[in-house]
Amino acid sequence: MSYGYDDESKRKRRYIVITISSVLLISMVVAVTVGVSLNKHDGDSKGKAEVNASVKAVKDVCAPTDYRKTCEDTLIKNGKNTTDPMELVKTAFNVTMKQITDAAKKSQTIMELQKDSRTRMALDQCKELMDYALDELSNSFEELGKFEFHLLDEALINLRIWLSAAISHEETCLEGFQGTQGNAGETMKKALKTAIELTHNGLAIISEMSNFVGQMQIPGLNSRRLLAEGFPSWVDQRGRKLLQAAAAYSDVKPDIVVAQDGSGQYKTINEALQFVPKKRNTTFVVHIKAGLYKEYVQVNKTMSHLVFIGDGPDKTIISGNKNYKDGITTYRTATVAIVGNYFIAKNIGFENTAGAIKHQAVAVRVQSDESIFFNCRFDGYQDTLYTHSHRQFFRDCTISGTIDFLFGDAAAVFQNCTLLVRKPLPNQACPITAHGRKDPRESTGFVFQGCTIAGEPDYLAVKETSKAYLGRPWKEYSRTIIMNTFIPDFVQPQGWQPWLGDFGLKTLFYSEVQNTGPGSALANRVTWAGIKTLSEEDILKFTPAQYIQGDDWIPGKGVPYTTGLLAGNPAAATTTPSVSAAAPGFSTFTDTSGADSIAPTASPAASPESSISMAYTGTASPESSIKVSSSTETASPESSFTEASTASPESSIMVASTESSGSFFSMFT
């Protein structure tokens, strides 16, 4: 069907109004995630007709949400009877900002009254996470002033990532009270109830917008454009030269050199970080020479575009041993915590040496959006790598551990990585992954491409009593896709392990595609309702280009990168061949259609230290809803080992329909 110029122009203007109004509403909604309870007060009547019109406007805005009453009550009580969505948002935003300040003061007061050290840490952790949510709100609100129609697709994708991260912040706040004394945890849970509901509502509205825009198939909405050389615009000329170099620091002098032998400017990483420029928009490179660095490192939110380059994952090692058993929250046990966006690490080892007996002990926690890890090693036992939130890419890395050693709520892709199972405590099971998606609309999940699952010799000696599984659902909508990966015989025929009873078995999203090895057979896999069989079209949506918009920010970083499907997948991509050399212990794979399924050898050897630049073509596609077939549920595999469990999420949330809500969009026509 064709439209005249006036109709088309009007239609585009309407899309813009819809988007701006909705996005602003979401910004307001997410601000509330810092734990604000909005003041309750009775407003003077402005006239029955005016009130009715305002109530209708609020109801239309709240139509797609799961917690509709919370949405409506919040806007009606603070909306000054306006029918303008923009004014509703501005009013609520101003009220929320004031309440954020009040809530921060209140949390500080509660913390000062606590005697239990774990409770005090949990409250301080909540305060930190609230601060992150508020910062993200402010940045997103400012960016709305730069809104352009052709950037609509990018805006919606980023907002879904941001709202997913906000949900992670809320959940992590409450998780910190596990094992605490007193009622501080229940107090915070009640304080955050409305905020949590409003955040899920915000994600519902943005998801509705994404579905609507996707249906329209409007040309010109693929927004993020690479420069002619194939680099994102934020990578400056010096950074491009550095990241292209065969040896990452051979022809470009790093900004800072850390060396324990005194040959650099600083002997510790933390000393060096004091001199990293704040809120920098260009790359800042820290070369960390060989050595065992026993220190706890935090790349805070002001350290964006930071690059760590080591001398090899077995030579440059950052080591710690904080753990849950010694009274520290899981979130705070990380040896290295990375919050600043656009972080890159190459040729570095990270470890937590607390041991299996100390339970949760994180080596690295990653909250950095568009972060990259190449030729790195993450060693630990339980909860080794905490991929907390945002978009992350891991290439040629090794992750070792015992229980849930790869967990979190990030949208993370792992290419050509080794997942190395270690010996746990006697008779403990070893589920490898535990993804923590709380809402089905979150654009998060784990994707493994061309990886290898292997076991250390000590584990192989006890594999009959310490059974390994691909993963288990940490949260109700846990999502993990494993494709073109070598699965050994010690992975149980059931494949997946339940968390507790039937928790999440109907709502999780697990799929296995074109895997190899003696443990890859699907005949005896669990048949929970959440186990998915993906079509060829669906599989493409979980490749890096589409799933984490990787074509926008990974190419040109000196990191091997396969944009689409690997060889051996149905309809394997042919756009971007991976020209990198294979890491020792792995088979080379390319994007060549028609090749046999890859079967990388099970050696966990590290990849070469040299950085390799890649050719790149292609553009990112927006994430879209995926329809999958599901099988019937059967009895669960053997019971999960005893471990601190997560509270069951609230009532099930229906997956957003691809059909737009008529009442929601009618108010903008």
Swiss-Prot record:
Its EC number(s): 3.1.1.11
Residue stretches of biased makeup (Low complexity): 629-652
Binding sites annotated in the UniProt record for substrate: 330, 360, 472, 474
Statement: the UniProt record of this protein carries the keyword Disulfide bond: yes
Glycan-linked positions: 52, 81, 94, 281, 300, 416
Biological process per Gene Ontology, one example term: cell wall modification
Residues that span the membrane, as ranges: 16-36
Main localization of the protein described in the UniProt heading: membrane
Positions annotated as active site in the UniProt record: 383, 404
Region spans: Disordered: 615-669
Site (Transition state stabilizer): residue numbering on this chain: 382
Compositional bias segments (type: Polar residues): 616-628, 654-669
Recorded GO CC terms: membrane
GO MF assignments: enzyme inhibitor activity; pectinesterase activity
Free-text function comment from the UniProt entry: Acts in the modification of cell walls via demethylesterification of cell wall pectin.
Protein name, entry field: Probable pectinesterase/pectinesterase inhibitor 21
Organism ancestry: Eukaryota, Viridiplantae, Streptophyta, Embryophyta, Tracheophyta
